[in-house]
C-alpha cells in the first residue's frame, strides 16, 4: 500500500509541475508594460534625473506607432510633459500633482522597452517651442491677409478716382 500512495504522490507532484510550467509563460506576459505605462516609467526616470525644482507630468502622448510584438525591442515614443506644482523631493506620484500655471513644457522623444524586467528607456526632452512656431504662423497669415486687404482698398480708390475724372471725348 505504501507504494501505491507514493505513486499517487509522485503523480500529484507531476501534475503540480505541469501546471506550474503552463503558468510560467503567463507570469512572464504579465510583466509586459502597456505603451502608456512604459512612457510613465520613463517620465519617472526623467523626474529622478532632472535638476529642475518640480516634477513633470504627462501632458500629451502621441499615438502609438505600429510595433512588433517583442517587448525587448526598443519602441519609439514621443510625448509632452509639463511642470507640476509638486517639488521634486516629494514622494508623491506626478499623476497626483496639478500642473503649474505657466509651467515649463518639454517635448520628449526617444525609445522605451515594454519588458518590465528590463525597464530601459532612452529619452531626451527639450523646451517645447511649438507655441512660438504657432505664433510665427499667426503673424505670417495676418500679414498676408492685411496685404490682400490693402491691395483691395488701393484698387477701390483707383476705381473711384477713375469715375471722378471727366472723360474727354475725342
UniProtKB/Swiss-Prot annotation:
Q: According to the lineage, what is the superkingdom?
A: Eukaryota
Q: Which molecular function terms from Gene Ontology are attached?
A: lipopolysaccharide binding
The disulfide bonds in this chain are: 86-97, 108-125
Quote the PROSITE patterns the UniProt record gives: CATHELICIDINS_1, CATHELICIDINS_2
One term under GO cellular component: extracellular space
One Pfam match, given by its short name, reads CAP18_C
The compartments listed are: Secreted; Vesicle
Annotated region (Active core), positions in chain: 150-162
Could you tell me the keywords of this UniProt record? Antibiotic, Antimicrobial, Cleavage on pair of basic residues, Disulfide bond, Immunity, Innate immunity, Secreted, Signal
The UniProt entry, under InterPro entries, shows: Cathelicidin-like, Cathelicidin_CS, Cathlecidin_C, Cystatin_sf
* Propeptide cleavage-removed residue intervals: 31-131
A Gene Ontology biological process in which this protein takes part is: antimicrobial humoral immune response mediated by antimicrobial peptide
Q: Where is the signal peptide?
A: 1-30
Free-text comment about domains? The cathelin-like domain (CLD), which is the propeptide part, does not seem to exhibit auto-inhibitory function, as it does not inhibit the antibacterial activity of antibacterial peptide LL-37.
Q: Which family does it belong to?
A: Belongs to the cathelicidin family.
Function statement: Antimicrobial protein that is an integral component of the innate immune system. Binds to bacterial lipopolysaccharides (LPS). Acts via neutrophil N-formyl peptide receptors to enhance the release of CXCL2. Postsecretory processing generates multiple cathelicidin antimicrobial peptides with various lengths which act as a topical antimicrobial defense in sweat on skin. The unprocessed precursor form, cathelicidin antimicrobial peptide, inhibits the growth of Gram-negative E.coli and E.aerogenes with efficiencies comparable to that of the mature peptide LL-37 (in vitro).
What is the protein name stated in its UniProt record? Cathelicidin antimicrobial peptide
Amino acid at each position: 500500500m505504501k507504494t501505491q500512495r507514493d505513486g499517487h504522490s509522485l503523480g500529484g507532484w507531476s501534475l503540480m509541475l505541469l501546471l506550474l510550467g503552463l503558468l510560467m509563460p503567463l507570469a512572464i506576459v504579465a510583466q509586459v508594460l502597456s505603451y502608456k505605462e512604459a512612457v510613465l516609467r520613463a517620465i519617472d526616470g526623467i523626474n529622478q534625473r532632472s535638476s529642475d525644482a518640480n516634477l513633470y507630468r504627462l501632458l500629451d502622448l502621441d499615438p502609438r506607432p505600429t510595433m512588433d510584438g517583442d517587448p525587448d525591442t526598443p519602441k519609439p515614443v514621443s510625448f509632452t510633459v509639463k511642470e507640476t506644482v509638486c517639488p521634486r523631493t516629494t514622494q508623491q506620484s506626478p499623476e497626483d500633482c496639478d500642473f503649474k500655471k505657466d509651467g515649463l513644457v518639454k517635448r520628449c522623444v526617444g525609445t522605451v522597452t515594454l519588458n518590465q524586467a528590463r525597464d530601459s528607456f532612452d529619452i531626451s526632452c527639450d523646451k517645447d517651442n511649438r507655441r512660438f512656431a504657432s505664433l510665427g504662423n499667426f503673424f505670417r497669415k495676418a500679414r498676408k491677409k492685411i496685404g490682400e486687404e490693402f491691395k483691395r482698398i488701393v484698387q477701390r480708390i483707383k476705381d473711384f478716382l477713375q469715375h471722378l475724372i471727366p472723360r474727354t471725348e475725342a
